[in-house]
Amino acid sequence: MYDIKKWRHIFKLDPAKHISDDDLDAICMSQTDAIMIGGTDDVTEDNVIHLMSKIRRYPLPLVLEISNIESVMPGFDFYFVPTVLNSTDVAFHNGTLLEALKTYGHSIDFEEVIFEGYVVCNADSKVAKHTKANTDLTTEDLEAYAQMVNHMYRLPVMYIEYSGIYGDVSKVQAVSEHLTETQLFYGGGISSEQQATEMAAIADTIIVGDIIYKDIKKALKTVKIKESSK
């Protein structure tokens, strides 16, 4: 079993987006700590299987971040289950999870399931609209969410998601200071080695996604943060 606490860098691939075989090979051979498959819309069983089958040729951890029950399947090392803490719709807190457990609970290996306390921060993102997230958050709001995740829910991961834009470093720093046990994931807008370095100095793990489809060379440079220590 892999130890996710040692992961500093994850590449996140959207099964609904095209990636060439050469670019996928470069991503999987880049020394990233893991590959995560996940997206907001058009995530289907077919496109998840298609992408998973290509990545499985490489010897690195593979994660499915669950966005709908229909695309859940065996064959992944971990299943990351988001609970969107700032969603106004209970379905994105635990409603989808409830349905999944009713259907698959008898066959789940819970050692492979990681519960993520998600906070969505970009109002213009697809994920914010889809999850009906309240993104009008102060630093104090985020600190309270961090305390909730770390001390009360005791979740293994808190994921600060800016999805498409580079986040407010001071707010991410404030969250980090309140997490003593929970691992901090940051994702959103990382498009350069400099941004990756800046966020990796605060978060335990950075998630790099969109830039893969815009500039593969810049995406690959973000892996260099593994050479530094947090």
From Swiss-Prot:
The keyword Cytoplasm does not apply. SUPFAM superfamilies: FMN-linked oxidoreductases. Sn-glycerol 1-phosphate binds at K12, Y159, I160, E161, Y162, S163, G164, G189, G209, D210. Keywords: Lipid biosynthesis, Lipid metabolism, Magnesium, Metal-binding, Phospholipid biosynthesis, Phospholipid metabolism, Transferase. Its cofactor is Mg(2+). Its EC number is 2.5.1.n9. Gene3D superfamilies: FMN-linked oxidoreductases. NCBIfam families: GGGP-family, PRK04169.1-1, PRK04169.1-3, PRK04169.1-4. Homodimer. Belongs to the GGGP/HepGP synthase family. Group I subfamily. Prenyltransferase that catalyzes in vivo the transfer of the heptaprenyl moiety of heptaprenyl pyrophosphate (HepPP; 35 carbon atoms) to the C3 hydroxyl of sn-glycerol-1-phosphate (G1P), producing heptaprenylglyceryl phosphate (HepGP). This reaction is an ether-bond-formation step in the biosynthesis of archaea-type G1P-based membrane lipids found in Bacillales. HAMAP family: GGGP_HepGP_synthase (MF_00112). PANTHER family: HEPTAPRENYLGLYCERYL PHOSPHATE SYNTHASE (PTHR40029:SF2), PTHR40029. This is Heptaprenylglyceryl phosphate synthase. It comes from Staphylococcus aureus (strain Mu3 / ATCC 700698). The gene is pcrB.
